[in-house]
């Protein structure tokens, strides 16, 4: 009787899997060995003889020091940032000390000077004409022109230019007109000594600064934010500034303090030659036992915002008011 052939091993037979996986290894060994798998009898790791190990340097994080950065990208970023910062300071936000005007204000005054014939001209016309010097849109030109009109020194307005006391906005540029004041005509312009440079597109010429004989920086005041710095100079009284100029020429002492178009009571004890700050409060008159009249308000505050704050305090029970007119 013939013997039955042996049963063919299946994948479920561990010995069959072991026999299949055995291949000649390095140095004539067949199959995986404890050394090649990195496991020893004691459970400790061991490197295979045919694997080369190298020591890798560990990188330690250090705080970034800009002074030590010298790469090409860093130099490019530094250069571009400085160019942008210088542009914003010179050409947008900060006034020049020589004439006290920001670039947009100077370009508005120069446009009015070139178009001046003594008559009123539409604000929309001046805004469009000024855009050949100022490439930052008509809105910024129109807003700056309205501010100059409300200062009442350099530009005379005709129409609704808003109200600093009530906070009302100006009418549309096509409905209002303006022209230079006589003070601006005589004290700001002198074509013979005005240095001109090409405009932003090279098609026109505009002044570097105006040969102003007035301390406009103190007359108008300014507030601007640039890259890395800001400027805020409070406005001053025009006759007091002229008296101060005369005192300087005569080598006499003088005292100049800020002055605001809306009035108010000012505490200037901390104000010293532009350093420190002033505190301005509303000026109140007691008419009778039950009536208080607010005669003057601080700068930056309008009658509408003041009424709203009084009504809010009344609703919260902080203030008792019978009527508000």
Regions found by a protein language model. Give the residues of each.
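Gly/Lys-enriched N-terminal cap/neck module of very large, oligomeric protein machines
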Residues: 277-325
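Catalytic phosphate-handling regions of large nucleic-acid enzymes and associated NTPases
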Residues: 2-277
């Amino acid at each position: 009787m013939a013997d039955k052939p042996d049963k063919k091993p299946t994948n479920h037979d561990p010995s069959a899997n072991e026999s299949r996986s055995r291949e000649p290894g390095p140095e004539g060994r067949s199959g995986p060995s404890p050394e090649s798998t990195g496991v020893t009898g004691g459970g400790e790791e061991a490197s295979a003889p045919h694997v080369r190990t190298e020591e890798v340097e560990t990188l330690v994080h250090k705080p970034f020091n800009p002074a030590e950065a010298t790469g090409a990208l860093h130099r490019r970023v530094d250069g571009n940032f400085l160019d942008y910062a210088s542009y914003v300071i010179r050409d947008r936000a900060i006034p020049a000390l020589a004439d006290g005007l920001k670039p947009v204000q100077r370009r508005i005054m120069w446009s009015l000077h070139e178009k001046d014939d003594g008559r009123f001209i539409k604000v929309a016309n001046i805004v469009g004409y000024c855009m050949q010097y100022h490439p930052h849109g008509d809105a910024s030109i129109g807003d700056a022109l309205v501010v100059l009109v409300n200062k009442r020194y350099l530009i005379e307005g005709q129409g609704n230019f808003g109200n600093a006391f009530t906070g009302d906005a100006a009418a549309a540029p096509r409905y209002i007109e303006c022209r230079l004041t006589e003070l601006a005509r005589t004290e700001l312009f002198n074509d013979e000594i005005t240095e001109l440079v090409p405009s932003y597109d090279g098609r026109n010429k505009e002044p570097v600064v105006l040969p102003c004989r007035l301390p406009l920086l103190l007359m108008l005041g300014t507030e601007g934010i640039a890259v890395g710095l800001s400027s805020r100079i409070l406005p001053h009284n025009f006759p007091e500034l002229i008296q101060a100029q005369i005192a300087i020429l005569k080598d006499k002492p003088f005292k100049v303090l800020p002055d605001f178009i809306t009035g108010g009571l000012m505490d200037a004890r901390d104000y010293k030659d532009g350093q420190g700050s002033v505190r301005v409060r509303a000026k109140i008159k007691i008419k009778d036992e039950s009536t208080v009249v607010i005669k003057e308000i601080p700068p930056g505050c309008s009658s509408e915002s003041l009424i709203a704050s009084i009504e809010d305090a009344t609703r919260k029970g902080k203030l008792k008011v019978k009527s508000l007119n």
